[in-house]
């Protein structure tokens, strides 16, 4: 009788990948945040680069990062319980559920930094999945506290500029720009200081010559960058 040979065991190795979810690289037409993750060789506008495909993900780690004050908050005491929670929509099948039925992957302590920003310090910076996630291609982070979802001011605005009067016409009035804020103007590499902010117009001392009257205005104080570290199992 011929002996039956056991099938060889497939070994697995652990891979680690880091990515930075940058709000200025969110997917077009997706607000507030939604990101597409692709290997570095395929990166371009509105793509978050990773070393390779994120498959068989078993653990996710987050590090401290800054956020602007949400539109619903004015003071640090407005954060109920001094906590903020982060939930990834695509990973909803594996998440922590709190007593209110809300889901999250990470809990943060809110630490004041300035009148414009707070720092989020992870209470537990690691989330281990019960079952490996087959693939992570998109991530949509949702922030909330015990009062509900948090909405943030935009970090990029499409605006009209008048070089003759050195003013920029804002598309909305409920922005959070104020005198003294520093902004980037598309096509010009230096930070510009807002000399005066009145209604839905901001005035800058010297607006550089631009090829178009319609430009992008980048607002550094509103930018959110979420540092994540993934651990995956790969067959070898």
UniProtKB/Swiss-Prot annotation:
Induction line: Expressed in the late phase of the viral replicative cycle.
Subcellular location: Virion
Keyword terms, alphabetized: Late protein, Virion
A single cellular component GO annotation: virion component
Chief location bin: virion
Protein family membership: Belongs to the asfivirus H240R family.
Function in brief: Forms the penton at the fivefold vertices of the icosahedral capsid. Together with the minor capsid proteins (p17, p49, and M1249L), forms a complicated network immediately below the outer capsid shell, stabilizing the whole capsid.
Protein name: Penton protein H240R
Organism from which the protein derives: African swine fever virus (isolate Warthog/Namibia/Wart80/1980) (ASFV)
């Amino acid at each position: 009788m011929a002996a039956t040979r056991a099938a060889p065991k497939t070994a697995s190795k652990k891979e680690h990948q880091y990515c930075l979810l940058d709000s200025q690289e969110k997917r077009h037409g997706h607000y507030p945040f939604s990101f597409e993750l692709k290997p570095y060789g395929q990166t371009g506008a509105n793509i978050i680069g990773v070393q390779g495909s994120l498959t068989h993900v078993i653990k996710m780690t987050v590090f401290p990062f800054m956020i602007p004050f949400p539109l619903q908050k004015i003071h640090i005491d407005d954060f109920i319980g001094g906590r903020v929670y982060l939930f990834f929509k695509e990973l909803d099948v594996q998440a922590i559920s709190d007593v209110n039925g809300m889901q999250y992957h990470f809990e943060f302590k809110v630490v004041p930094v300035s009148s414009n920003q707070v720092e989020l310090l992870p209470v537990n910076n690691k989330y281990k999945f019960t079952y490996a996630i087959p693939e992570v291609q998109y991530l949509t982070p949702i922030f909330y506290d015990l009062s509900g979802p948090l909405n943030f001011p935009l970090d990029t605005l499409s605006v009209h500029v008048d070089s003759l009067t050195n003013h920029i016409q804002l598309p909305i009035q409920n922005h959070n720009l104020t005198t003294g804020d520093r902004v980037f103007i598309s096509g010009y590499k230096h930070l510009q200081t807002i000399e005066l902010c009145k209604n839905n117009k901001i005035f800058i001392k010297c607006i550089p010559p631009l090829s178009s009257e319609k430009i992008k205005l980048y607002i550094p104080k509103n930018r959110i960058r979420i540092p994540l570290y993934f651990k995956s199992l790969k067959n070898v």
